[in-house]
Each structure stands twice: as structure tokens, then as C-alpha cells.
């Protein structure tokens, strides 16, 4: 009971503690969102991010005006956690190529990575058009609006994305987290279960569902969700992560009173 009353207090000051996994390029280049969004910097899962930065950086420095080289370098920097540098590279490229929507999408995402949410939203708006909307960018715009506390507006963007790709799990997952941030945990669970049941959901959806179930006090059920059908080592890691995230809601010093959000999902 104490945990649930504590949750209610912390939810009152909810803020997103999340990673934007946002697949933002007009092509299928995704890197780490949202949701959704995980642009993988066009590397294999076993690639060394530092090596990718080195290789793409050499190509970029050889021709800084090359839009594709700038895009690849920016994505590699983001994947390596060098967010400020990624934003700087993508900003310069966007200035040099103002009509390149893939660059605008990546730049908007990089701005969001750095906490510049309003600027990110404005740039993302230029990355697609009303007559040719990109559902991935719509979902990312939703996550940015959620970061700004504009949850009703965010859900309009998720709804627009879902009209293009019905039942897309990455969008549903972001929508579910939006409900978490506005303290509607039953609706969040319902939405995340729908995402999880699709058979196309990634590990973040599983983690987010487990987190929402745990936030409602059903800890045994939450553990069973995050470790189901996984090898023992991965199951143990997921359970440890769940406990870490849940502990943050009861420890004001660990998260500034924020509700923990496992991760936003990025459409691939």
C-alpha cells in the first residue's frame, strides 16, 4: 500500500526518463526511440560503435558537403553516445541541404537527444509534409510532445501514425508510455499489452509492459513478463533492470521524483 501511495505522489511530478529510440530517416536507416525508433546507424549488431564513428568520420571529413556522409556520421555519433557532436554535424548538414528530409529527421532526433525538445519538434515538422506524412516521424513528434508535457497533443500524433500503420507495436508502446506520464496506468497497461501481443514487439515493449504492471504493485507478474521465454542470463538481466527502475519511484534521490520510463520505442 505504501508503494502505491508513494507512486501516486511521484506521478504528480512525472517526467520522462527515457531514451528516444527514434528511426527517423526517410529511408530505412534507424539508429538507436520511441519508441521507435531505433536507428541502427546502418551497422550490424556486432559492429564496434567507435570503429563506425572512425570510418564514417573519415568519409565525412573527406567531403563535409556530402549529405549521405554527414547523415551516416551523425548517426554513428549518436549510436556511440556522442550526442552533442552528432547534433552539431547534423545541424551543419541541414543548413547546407535545407530540403533534405532525411537530414532534418536525423537532426530533429539529435536535438531531442540533447533535451532541446521544442526545437526538435519544429525541425521534425519540416522533415515530412501533411500530404506525405512519415509515420515514424509522427511517432517521434509524439514522444517529443510527451517530453514537453503536452500529452493530449502527443496522442493525436500517435493516432495519426496508427492510421498509417495500424497496431504498429513501437507506436503503441510510445502511446502506452504517454498514458503512464498522465497517471492512467490501466490504460497504459491495456495499450502495452496490445503492442506486446502483436508478435512484432521488441524487448523495450516487454520492459515497458513489465514496468507498468510493477508500478501497479503486481511485482511477481511484472517479473514473469520481463523474463518470459528468455535465456536465464537475459531473464536475470531484465529482472534486475525492472527492479532498478521500480526502485527509482520510491527513492527521491535517485530520480528527482520522476516516474521511471524504461524506454521509448523507435520504429525500425
Whereabouts are the PLM-identified features?
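N-terminal leader/linker segments that initiate helical-solenoid repeat arrays
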Residues: 2, 16, 23-72, 76-80, ...
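Canonical tetratricopeptide repeat
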Residues: 72, 106, 139-140, 174, ...
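Helix-start (N-cap) detector for alpha-helical repeat units in TPR-like alpha-solenoids
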Residues: 67-68, 101-102, 134-136, 151, ...
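Structural marker of alpha-solenoid helical repeat scaffolds
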Residues: 62-63, 96-97, 127-131, 164, ...
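Terminal, low-structured helical/coil segments at or just beyond the last alpha-helical repeat
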Residues: 31-36, 199, 203-205, 212-268
Amino acid at each position: 500500500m505504501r508503494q502505491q501511495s508513494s507512486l501516486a505522489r511521484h506521478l504528480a511530478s512525472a517526467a520522462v526518463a527515457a531514451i528516444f529510440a527514434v528511426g527517423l530517416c526517410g529511408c530505412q536507416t534507424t539508429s538507436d526511440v520511441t519508441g521507435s525508433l531505433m536507428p541502427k546507424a546502418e551497422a550490424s549488431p556486432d559492429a564496434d560503435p567507435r570503429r563506425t564513428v572512425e570510418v564514417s568520420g573519415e568519409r565525412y571529413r573527406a567531403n563535409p558537403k556530402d549529405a549521405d556522409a554527414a547523415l551516416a556520421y551523425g548517426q554513428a555519433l549518436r549510436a556511440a553516445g556522442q550526442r552533442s557532436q552528432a547534433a552539431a554535424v547534423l545541424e551543419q548538414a541541414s543548413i547546407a541541404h535545407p530540403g533534405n528530409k532525411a537530414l532534418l529527421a536525423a537532426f530533429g532526433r539529435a536535438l531531442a537527444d540533447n533535451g532541446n525538445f521544442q526545437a526538435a519538434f519544429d525541425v521534425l515538422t519540416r522533415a515530412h509534409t501533411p500530404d506525405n506524412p512519415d509515420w515514424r516521424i509522427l511517432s517521434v513528434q509524439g514522444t517529443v510532445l510527451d517530453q514537453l508535457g503536452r500529452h493530449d497533443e502527443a496522442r493525436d500524433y500517435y493516432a495519426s501514425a496508427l492510421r498509417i500503420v495500424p497496431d504498429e507495436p513501437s507506436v503503441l508502446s510510445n502511446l502506452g508510455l504517454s498514458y503512464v506520464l498522465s497517471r492512467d496506468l490501466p490504460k497504459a497497461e491495456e495499450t502495452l499489452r496490445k503492442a506486446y501481443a502483436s508478435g512484432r514487439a521488441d524487448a523495450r515493449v516487454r520492459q515497458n509492459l513489465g514496468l507498468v504492471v510493477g508500478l501497479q504493485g503486481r511485482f511477481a507478474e511484472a517479473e514473469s513478463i520481463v523474463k518470459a521465454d528468455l535465456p536465464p542470463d537475459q531473464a536475470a538481466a531484465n529482472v534486475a533492470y525492472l527492479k532498478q527502475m521500480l526502485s527509482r519511484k520510491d527513492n527521491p534521490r535517485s530520480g528527482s521524483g520522476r516516474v521511471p520510463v524504461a524506454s521509448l520505442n523507435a520504429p525500425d
